[in-house]
Amino acid sequence: MKLYNLKKKQDQVNFSKAVKLGLGKNQGLFFPKELPILTKEQLYKLLKMDFLTRSSKILSMFIGDEIHYSELTKRIKNAFSFTTPKIVSISKNIACFELFHGPTLAFKDFGARFMAQILSFLNHDKNDTITILTATSGDTGAAVAHAFFKMKNVRVIILYPKGKISELQEKLFCTLGENIITIAVNGSFDECQKLVKQAFNDDQLRIETGLNSANSINISRLLAQICYYFEAFALLTKKQQKNLVISVPCGNFGNLTAGLLAKALGLPIKSFIASTNSNDTVPRFLKTGFWKPNNTVSTISNAMDISQPNNWPRVEELFKRKFWSLKTLKYGSVSDILTKKSLKKLAFLGYVSEPHAAVAYYTLKNKLKQNEFGLFLGTAHPAKFKKTIEKILQITLFLPSKLRNQIKLPLLSHNIRPDFSKLKKFLLEK
């Protein structure tokens, strides 16, 4: 598999190199040079397979012979060793696709655990230490931390905006210690992402620390997420499959990119909805044609509090490659007031959700046509937002054992200002 740098297309690497580098020159994202296309017969066979077998087939289409199929299958089995995604009916023509049944109760478990398995394989006969540097607006931190926890020759540094993620999200990854180092940045998530990008642009840091990223900018995480879109389609009836619309809660737009890649492979999804909160750079761009990121605002759907989404260049590249018009991509932005109304509506229908899924549900409900079937993605367990949900819905949420075990542990985070010189010093000395 060859991938090219979106900022310098002559900069081409194989899959293994792309995973190890994370980003190309000039902070460019890697994108597949060739996109496989499934025949109707191949698609039919894939949809009949179980989740793990199908995932192995899909990922081998991209990775090819760089990793032997038997080894890839083993790594996928290790990565996806948890309850498969579920579809829960909400109303006659709407359902939620729950992706939060993994170790850290969020969809990020799929990509983070697959990336950890791939890096472990690529580094198994080497003694070089890899430094995973990543920024999180909520769920990525926990997924990455647990995926790489105690992994040999890997240290993980996670930046997050201080006071701007939920207490339970913070407890899931800032209490581990060992090879997991967490840094609370006195700033926004966009400032955390900027620090990560500056680090990747620093040759000294990259060489001396073996720098890599576990954000959705890493191609291994992105490709892993394609797999659950096929699972969603396979779980539906033929009638539901016919005019399928999927609403994706969007922050960094990696989840949407993966869904669009699944469509590009031949999965017959009618359309996608890019659903954001008040940080609506993309909806405004799709409406006006002008890319004007505003200052990031804090919302109750905090994992989407991102004004400059990293993966948007990949979305644009895919639309160009497939000759799709961006006008066909539906979109919507949802305020906190409407998010709360959406949560209450879902609760009235008998489904307790959380803010990110509620955003996706709101846009889906308002854009779905009579002859269409809609899925919205449930990206995190409601208990991760316990205080918010209990306050809005006036209910008591019980914590899953995974959260109960960590809520009592002390935070081990360091604190810094959003100053790259401070981060660089920390990385070189730690």
UniProtKB/Swiss-Prot annotation:
Catalytic activity: O-phospho-L-homoserine + H2O = L-threonine + phosphate
Broad EC category: lyase
Matching Pfam families: PALP (PF00291), Thr_synth_N (PF14821)
Gene name, Swiss-Prot/TrEMBL: thrC
Record-linked Gene3D superfamilies: 3.40.50.1100, Threonine synthase, N-terminal domain (3.90.1380.10)
InterPro entries: Ser/Thr_deHydtase_PyrdxlP-BS, Thr_synth_N, Thr_synth_N_sf, Thr_synthase-like, Threonine_Synthase, TrpB-like_PALP, TrpB-like_PALP_sf
Residues with the N6-(pyridoxal phosphate)lysine modification: 108
Cited function: Catalyzes the gamma-elimination of phosphate from L-phosphohomoserine and the beta-addition of water to produce L-threonine.
UniProt keyword list: Amino-acid biosynthesis, Lyase, Pyridoxal phosphate, Threonine biosynthesis
Transmembrane stretches, start-end: none
Any single GO BP term: threonine biosynthetic process
Phylogenetic classification of the source organism: Bacteria, Pseudomonadati, Pseudomonadota, Gammaproteobacteria, Enterobacterales
Organism superkingdom: Bacteria
Keyword Phosphoprotein: no
GO function terms (MF aspect): pyridoxal phosphate binding; threonine synthase activity
Cofactors, names only: pyridoxal 5'-phosphate
Protein name: Threonine synthase
Species assigned in the record: Buchnera aphidicola subsp. Baizongia pistaciae (strain Bp)
PROSITE patterns: DEHYDRATASE_SER_THR (PS00165)
